[in-house]
Amino acid sequence: MDKKSPGQTGKDQRIETGVNRGKEIEIFITNHRVRASEGETIGAVLTAIGMRQVRHAPQLKDFRGLYCCMGSCYGCLVTVNGRPNERACVTPAQAGQQITLQEGFGRPDMASPDPAPARLVRREVPLVIIGGGPGGLSAAIAAANTGAKVLVIDENLQAGGQIYRQLPQTFQVEAPAILGSDYVDGRSLFGQVQELSNAITIWNDALVWSVGESNQLVVTRGNELVLLDAKSIVVSTGAYERPVPVPGWTLPGVMTAGGAQVLLKNQRVRPGRRVLLAGNGPLQLVVANQMLDAGMEVI
């Protein structure tokens, strides 16, 4: 990066062992040139260079940062190429992007061209599975083995869910064992899905907006609005954390355990060097172990 961006602190937090990152690109954050790799999200790039303060809420000085890292909380909204309110945690970095850290909810650039209207598509599907995590993929395999044709719909760029989160396709894995058992087990499950590719279709980066009467689903996928008439539907959407609000819970640098896990597993970026884990449940111990493996200090 040419010079330090506002709010940037510390060393680069990328974990370079075990993977070869995608092609190096340049993006611009508040007019500062920043190094990124194809496949990284904007949120991962911000975290890697130490920028915890992503925006402030409508109230001045109410600063916000990455929190859930899975697109659920909308706490990390940024403006990308003039388009406001993009979620930094799930928006891929692309060469030449102009990223502006927002004040409040941002305003659209009225001089920019209107996006093309969505194309309406309608089709019939025997079985739709909503969610491409371990449960959804296992259900798809079981159904396909009975001869059913299956469509799996997942909102992420890659299937796998929180447990089997995979690296971006632009990353080359050099040492799978370093990535942990979840990565290895996930690859095994994906291999089973691939063997049944004649029966299983996966739509990534697609959102199910509603399920109506007679099992009709409304799905957005790219620039398409898809109406699906399904004979059967399996809901396997997983879950996300709902933390108890405490004073300071929205401060930059505070995030959910699941959010930290996304950065570690999917982006190979440390959420920090020294971290305090607060809460209960088995996930805390799993994340603590993953943080230690990444060279972080857990206090």
Regions found by a protein language model. Give the residues of each.
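Short amphipathic alpha-helical face segments that pack within enzyme cores
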Residues: 41-45, 138, 255-259
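A short alpha-helix-loop-beta-strand transition element characteristic
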Residues: 52-56, 269-271, 297
